[in-house]
Amino acid sequence: MSLQSSRVLLHRKHDWSTCRNLPARWWSHPRSYHQESQHADRKPASASASAWTEPLSKSHSRSSGRQRAREKMADKEFFLSLLTSATTKREAKAYLSRFPSVKKTKLPMTPKKEAAVELQPPKEIEKPGVNLGSFYGPTRSVLQTPVFRQGSTPEIETAINLDEALHVALVKLTDAQSLDDETIHGVALTLSQLTRLGMASCVVVDPGPVKDATTWRKAAAEQADRLSAAIDACDGGKARRLDSVLVRNKDGEVPKVISRQVLLRPLRKNHIVVVTPVAYSEQTCKASSVASNDVMIALTRELAGLERKHDPDEDPRVTAENFAALQKEISVDRLIVLDPVGGIPAFKGPQRAHVFVNMEQEFRGIETELQEAMASLEGYVDPGTESDLSAAAMKSNPISKFVATEVTRMPTRPQHKPLPVNGGVMNSAIKEHVENLRLLQQTLTLLPPSSSGIITTPTDVANSARPQQDILSVSQVGTRSSKNLLIHNLLTDKPAYSSSLPSERLGRTTPSIVQSTFLKRGMPLTILPDPRITPWSPNSPDSRHLTLDDPRIDLSRLVHLIEDSFNRKLDVQDYLNRVNGRLAGLIIAGEYEGGAILTWETPPSIPESERNNPENLPRLVPYLDKFAVLKRSQGAGGVADIVFNAMVRTCLPQGVCWRSRMDNPVNKWYFERSRGTWKLDGSNWAMFWTTPGVPEEDSLRFKDYEAVCRSIQPSWADKKAVDD
């Protein structure tokens, strides 16, 4: 098969409506030729020509058959990877809104011809995004769902909107020379699949620790060639290596991109750009090695439009318009760090890794946590803990105990897990975690809040890209392939598992997920009273004097948050009368995008007048009175996880209870995050709690929980009773 025909086939597989008719068109050619040869038996010359060309035709057919088989297998692996990463309808709609389908102009259907149809090489069309309308075409169930496909005409003419933003993922591949060929191929395959889904990739190849600059440049070039070859070997993959794209004035400073278009041209052609960490001096044109983190920062600044040169005398409005145009041209959606050390480990509290990091709230705390862990390596530790902690730092804890943190534990809690004496390798690993954390903090600050980052291992990405039969041994049994972390993240903009999900809910089937950390610039978190100063308790003076009329609280926005989340009007005065005087605290995420109101409730068996007696204070029930998230923030951005984690890990780690209607669709989310649940007979309420030892070790506490959940009266303006 000619190179041109190969390119045609590779291109046509991206348009499923074309691929669906490909076998019929291709095999119609041999049948037509056979009929013509039979008709030509009357002419000896034609018969002789047929005898010479028939073996060539059979050889050509066999070659094309093998090519189609390879393409079919590649498509099968791609669709399987996509389906195993499939998400909810809400998340699919969000993905389609971020990656809109290419505009289509429908043509009237034409009847299929019975005569021979030659396979003519069409003009190759470069798509700036992904056309999910045709992508989901062959699946019948999805075909009937308007979310994934609009219209039913199979033959369409595509018009490309070149003004659509180019979605880009900046990828850092760390210590590439330590990775085997199989891992490199798996990473290349995943990057190719991301390209098919509309996410162009620009990869910075870090060769790893090298002694001198000359060896560094040589190793960087070798590893870039290695990755490029692996990408080109993938079905439909195209790599473009760039060696001379960076310049800098002097050593030590962050380089700059020579030309913006040098990056954009191959990206718009669906090529995966591979950048070597080498910069040239503007004065001497001498090449020098550059830290890969500095390259990532330089690329981020360039693609974000921050390196645009403007005339100081230019009208500020013109400058703003030009800057806005640059930002609309490119959308840096993902920052991906593929590092053998994996996600960021946690050394405080019971969690073993940070699965989701709200940078606005947690960056300083996690950075300090890692620095303190490095400092503690110099102290004495029980050697029995060495193997456990080595796994925690080196592989970011690939064990079944999986939990992340949104809000770090308070100083009053236990500080650090013991660390091993042998800290050479450990120290290096933790330093790598600190550098990765700082890199994503610096780059996410330059990007819109919608951008996100993810840290994971190349091995995990490679394994999830491989077919399941290649992963399982003969003695193993599996029903489905592992979820491709990067594809799942592209579709959902979330970690593979909710960060507020307790480790007990995950079982032993998700060890690889703890090797990843999902990061967003996020939002600030306001907690009243501040548990870092005064822990929440019934006898806390801060809690006793806190009311919703506090000047630190924007009551009108809080009421709007509650009414928008519950889709009901609140009787504000009645609600204030009920909760003021018994508030435990308030948690607000961002600009009132989410929040929780918690109270200390008195069990009905205790008279209200005796509520504050010292002997009754331990029996006051920590109660989640309102948990609300704006509709526009529900299911996105991790707002609910941030608030919930603050509640159960920072404010009330000893436990909290709440109730929910039996028909509330959020109950599954509650159920997964609670230690227990109980249906309240004779009502439409279900009770949840996170308190350890209830009811096995504390039956009185359980009875108090149930009594409080039964006795709370709603404060809605419609005055509906509890049975609503």
UniProtKB/Swiss-Prot annotation:
InterPro entries: AceGlu_kinase-like_sf (IPR036393), GlcNAc_Synth_fun (IPR011190), Vertebrate-like_GNAT_dom (IPR006855). Signal peptide: none annotated. GO terms for biological process: L-arginine biosynthetic process; ornithine biosynthetic process. The keyword Mitochondrion applies. Its EC number is 2.3.1.1. Residues 542-713 form the N-acetyltransferase domain. Residues 47-58 have a biased composition (Polar residues). It is found in: Mitochondrion. Residues 1-27 form a transit peptide. Disulfide bonds: none annotated. Its main location: mitochondrion. Pfam families: NAT (PF04768). Keywords: Acyltransferase, Amino-acid biosynthesis, Mitochondrion, Transferase, Transit peptide. It catalyses: L-glutamate + acetyl-CoA = N-acetyl-L-glutamate + CoA + H(+). PROSITE patterns: GNAT_NAGS. One of its GO terms (cellular component) is mitochondrial matrix. One of its GO terms (molecular function) is L-glutamate N-acetyltransferase activity. Belongs to the acetyltransferase family. N-acetylglutamate synthase involved in arginine biosynthesis. This is Amino-acid acetyltransferase, mitochondrial. It comes from Talaromyces marneffei (strain ATCC 18224 / CBS 334.59 / QM 7333) (Penicillium marneffei).
